[in-house]
Amino acid sequence: MARNTLSSRFRRVDIDEFDENKFVDEQEEAAAAAAEPGPDPSEVDGLLRQGDMLRAFHAALRNSPVNTKNQAVKERAQGVVLKVLTNFKSSEIEQAVQSLDRNGVDLLMKYIYKGFEKPTENSSAVLLQWHEKALAVGGLGSIIRVLTARKTV
């Protein structure tokens, strides 16, 4: 028993690695921000110019920055998604929403509610149309999951 208590193996664990308040160098943070996930704005713009709305929609929702704390990345992704949503024709919205799985509908709802937080000149009317179609596909559960989720977009 004395042999186990004198063991120093527990000292090899770096407990500061798990601390949220740990100091992070700004240069490391900037390098991590450059590698942050998010939709590629040039790819989405190219698809919008070609008129391929459905592929632009899926490209905008792909690699969403849910796990990052960098607000600049999140706002850039929100702008890209809002640009795609406002370019859709109202007759094509239902088809786009139905092409998503449950997690995709929840992610779309997160972006819709984020768009409601900061409305622009015509975005509220468009977002209400998207909300109607997403609610029809995802049900009330998608709203509850979005409002209770800890990870935001």
Swiss-Prot record:
It is found in: Cytoplasm, Cytoskeleton. One of its GO terms (cellular component) is Arp2/3 protein complex. InterPro entries: ARPC5, ARPC5_sf. Transmembrane segments: none annotated. May be a component of the Arp2/3 complex in which it may replace ARPC5. It holds the Pfam family P16-Arc. Keywords: Actin-binding, Cytoplasm, Cytoskeleton, Phosphoprotein. May function as component of the Arp2/3 complex which is involved in regulation of actin polymerization and together with an activating nucleation-promoting factor (NPF) mediates the formation of branched actin networks. One of its GO terms (biological process) is Arp2/3 complex-mediated actin nucleation. This is Actin-related protein 2/3 complex subunit 5-like protein. The modification Phosphoserine is found at S64. The keyword Cytoplasm applies. It comes from Homo sapiens (Human). GO terms for molecular function: actin filament binding. Disulfide bonds: none annotated. Gene3D superfamilies: Actin-related protein 2/3 complex subunit 5 (1.25.40.190). Belongs to the ARPC5 family.
